[in-house]
A protein has these predicted regions:
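Short gly/ser-rich loop at a beta-strand->alpha-helix junction or flexible surface loop bordering the NTP-binding
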Residues: 1-74
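Hydrophobic alpha-helical interaction segments
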Residues: 69-148
Length: 148
């Protein structure tokens, strides 16, 4: 068995800039770059891809999430899913993006930043064809996340 002694690359500002120019950042790193979570520099950047070659592929710095029908025209700016779109992505792709782990952070932060007004999220959900009940479920449990 070969063991590499080469140091794994760190998530740097330059790497994030490169990824934002070439991919769409989603999931945990979208919550970080939107200001709703603290960075974990050991966690790979999560990007969406419609290339089946990258299905379930992860290297030291990038985790590729294969979503062939991902709508790249709604809520994406400069390679980053915006706040509302990140919430919508967690609702549409909970398993792929780890919604159970990361959704509480963005819900709590978004709630504070927008004084409990989720109307922009509901508008984007309608545009993406997401049922209102999916967000309503998370909102019903929002107090549990805030109290933790």
């Amino acid at each position: 068995m070969l063991i590499s002694t080469k140091k794994l690359p760190e998530i740097s500002e330059g790497l994030i800039s490169f990824v934002l120019k070439n991919y769409i950042v989603v999931g945990f790193w979208a919550t970080v770059l939107n200001g709703y979570s603290y960075p974990c520099f050991e966690a790979p950047l999560t990007v969406v891809t419609d290339d089946s070659f990258f299905r379930d592929y992860q290297d030291a710095v990038v985790n590729y999430v294969y979503i062939p029908s991902y709508n790249k025209s709604v809520g994406i700016t400069d390679g980053l899913a915006g706040s509302e779109r990140t919430i919508c992505d967690f609702l549409m792709y909970p398993k792929e993006l780890g919604a159970g782990v990361y959704m509480p952070d963005i819900m709590e932060g978004y709630n504070e930043e927008n004084d409990g007004d989720f109307s922009k999220v509901y508008d984007m959900m309608a545009e993406l064809g997401i049922e209102r009940g999916k967000l309503d479920y998370w909102l019903e449990h929002l107090d549990e996340y805030i109290d933790e």
